[in-house]
Amino acid sequence: MVYSWRNAAWERDMRMARGEPLNVLPHLERGSGPSVSAPWQVKIEPGFSSFAGRTQDIRGYVNQLLTHVHSVVPPNALPQTPIYIMATAGMRMLKPEVRQAILLETCRVIREQPFYFDPDVQDYAGADTDTACGGHVRVITGEEEGMLGWLAVNYLMHEFGPQASTVGFLDMGGASSQIAFVPDSHDQNSRDLFHVTLHRLDASLDTHNVFVTTFLGYGTNAARTRYLYALSERLGAPRTLPDPCLSLIHI
């Protein structure tokens, strides 16, 4: 996913000149590239967790993503462009040492590129087995995954305006599910909420108390794997498993 944002002071001046309100969030936009029709996001399969035990194959995988980035970001902007790779539930289900090996190799690959990295990043290692490249490559928690999804959905739906109310977020991924929403004020318990503060162009704050919960192992792929295992256990592991829940082409 490639995106950019305007200088906040420039955008504020522009909106003032046009007589537009300033009590809005800064505008995010797709990064401009050689082609205005270049997609701002790309998805490839499989996920990072599939490289457990075969980290030598990560370079070719990551380079597919970097090829897309280079097609969108102008070459002269690469040194000012930070890059982050955030893995989700599939990686959370791996053993710590396996996660770390994948993250470190991923870090080696992107450090060869002319992107911007935090000046404090001196080597490939991170603070723990869930981070590398000083946090530019890491495995995010289920709560972070839910929070980021909630932020993205509400931003894209323009639900952060002064008169708007936010929407809830339910995400069933491949290996986990997340739920995030702002509860009613009388249901808010500060110990269970994430405090989100967004800064508008007029320097006012947009604050939200968000409840987030996550269920590792309850994504669509993980749930189906358990379902097939239960079928095989019940039927004695036959070569063909009768499954009334699938369409004919998948039986």
Q: Model-found features: residue ranges?
A:
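Extended hydrophobic secondary-structure segments that form protein cores and membrane-embedded regions
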Residues: 82-88, 136-142, 168-171
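Surface-exposed acidic, glycine-flexible loop patches that form ligand/cofactor-binding
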Residues: 71-79, 157-163, 168
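Active-site neighborhood for divalent-cation/phosphate handling
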Residues: 115-158, 174-177, 182
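Gly/Thr-rich phosphate-binding beta-strand-loop-beta motif of the actin/hexokinase/Hsp70
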Residues: 1-19, 155, 162-193
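Non-catalytic, alpha-helical, charged scaffold/linker segments
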Residues: 222, 228-247
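Solvent-exposed loop/turn segments at secondary-structure junctions
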Residues: 50, 89-93, 144-146, 174, ...
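Conserved phosphate-binding loops in N-terminal lobes of ATP-dependent enzymes
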Residues: 1-122, 191-193
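Conserved small/polar residues in nucleotide/adenosyl-binding loops
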Residues: 249-251
